[in-house]
């Protein structure tokens, strides 16, 4: 029995609250159960130097955790004077995932920065960040079109992510912290709304997993992501 009584393929309740903050072009509070992440999308005219003159835009991301988003306080990375390896890995993942959702040529020479700040962590913060940031990005792009700065919306479709893993020999979807910490295999999967894979991050923490188990985990992830994307689309319609 899972901690919340969920079935193996069931994601936690997902809530996406749009326009959560006042100033950002897109802002979303995303909740996967007790995991809560504030995602904002900020638009700047111009692109990084390596893209100047190429007529395309750029999407980048930053990720961070509030000191008491976890069970015990973690010092702010700013106080340490540098970002940790985990932070850099996650923010690069978020940026890669969201670039796959946008036609960068159609975006033109705009840069959109996605800031994902974890308010409360209970497993799956990177997958929640991708899911919420995608909705914030959609809102920001809609504002560019509404302002007449873009002729067409460059959004190609929704992108979402979910964690899957093997715990006590059972493949399960959307792991809470207590499950994640006990997982024999832990995997994060990012997909498009038509089921294409953007990224798979998978590690055997204990016993190596089989090819068949990998396929089972990917199928679980696809089902979970389909459910999450339905929630994303419903949020954007409200």
UniProtKB/Swiss-Prot annotation:
CDD domains per record: RNase_PH_bact
Example GO biological process: rRNA processing
Signal peptide from the UniProt entry: none
Keyword tRNA-binding: yes
Keyword set, alphabetical order: Nucleotidyltransferase, RNA-binding, rRNA processing, Transferase, tRNA processing, tRNA-binding
Gene3D superfamilies xref list: GHMP Kinase, N-terminal domain
Pfam annotation, one family: RNase_PH_C
UniProt binding sites for phosphate: 86, 124-126
EC number: 2.7.7.56
Catalytic activity: tRNA(n+1) + phosphate = tRNA(n) + a ribonucleoside 5'-diphosphate
SUPFAM superfamilies found in the cross-reference section: Ribonuclease PH domain 2-like, Ribosomal protein S5 domain 2-like
Recorded GO MF terms: 3'-5'-RNA exonuclease activity; tRNA binding; tRNA nucleotidyltransferase activity
Top-level EC class: transferase
tRNA processing is among the record's keywords: yes
Homology family: Belongs to the RNase PH family.
Primary role: Phosphorolytic 3'-5' exoribonuclease that plays an important role in tRNA 3'-end maturation. Removes nucleotide residues following the 3'-CCA terminus of tRNAs; can also add nucleotides to the ends of RNA molecules by using nucleoside diphosphates as substrates, but this may not be physiologically important. Probably plays a role in initiation of 16S rRNA degradation (leading to ribosome degradation) during starvation.
Quaternary structure note: Homohexameric ring arranged as a trimer of dimers.
Name of this protein: Ribonuclease PH
Organism: Klebsiella pneumoniae subsp. pneumoniae (strain ATCC 700721 / MGH 78578)
Phylogenetic placement of the source organism: Bacteria, Pseudomonadati, Pseudomonadota, Gammaproteobacteria, Enterobacterales
């Amino acid at each position: 029995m899972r901690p919340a009584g969920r079935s193996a393929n069931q994601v936690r309740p997902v809530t996406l609250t749009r326009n959560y903050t006042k100033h950002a072009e897109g802002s979303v509070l995303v909740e996967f159960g007790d995991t809560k992440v504030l995602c904002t999308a900020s638009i700047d005219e111009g692109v990084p130097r390596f893209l100047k003159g190429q007529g395309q835009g750029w999407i980048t991301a930053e990720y961070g955790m509030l000191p008491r988003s976890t069970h015990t306080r973690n010092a702010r990375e700013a106080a340490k004077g540098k970002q940790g390896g985990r932070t850099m890995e996650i923010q690069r993942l978020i940026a890669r995932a969201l670039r796959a959702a946008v036609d960068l040529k159609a975006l033109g020479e705009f840069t959109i920065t996605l800031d994902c700040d974890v308010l409360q962590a209970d497993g799956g913060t990177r997958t929640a960040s991708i899911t919420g940031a995608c909705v914030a990005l959609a809102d920001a792009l809609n504002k560019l079109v509404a302002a007449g700065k873009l002729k067409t919306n460059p959004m190609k479709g929704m992108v979402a992510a979910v964690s899957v893993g093997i715990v006590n020999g059972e493949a399960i979807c959307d792991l809470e912290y207590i499950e994640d910490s006990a997982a024999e295999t832990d995997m994060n999967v990012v997909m498009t709304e038509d089921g294409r894979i953007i990224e798979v991050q998978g590690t055997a923490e204990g016993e190596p997993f089989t090819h068949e188990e990998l396929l089972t985990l990917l199928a679980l992830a696809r089902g979970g992501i389909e459910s999450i994307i339905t929630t994303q689309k419903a949020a954007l319609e409200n």
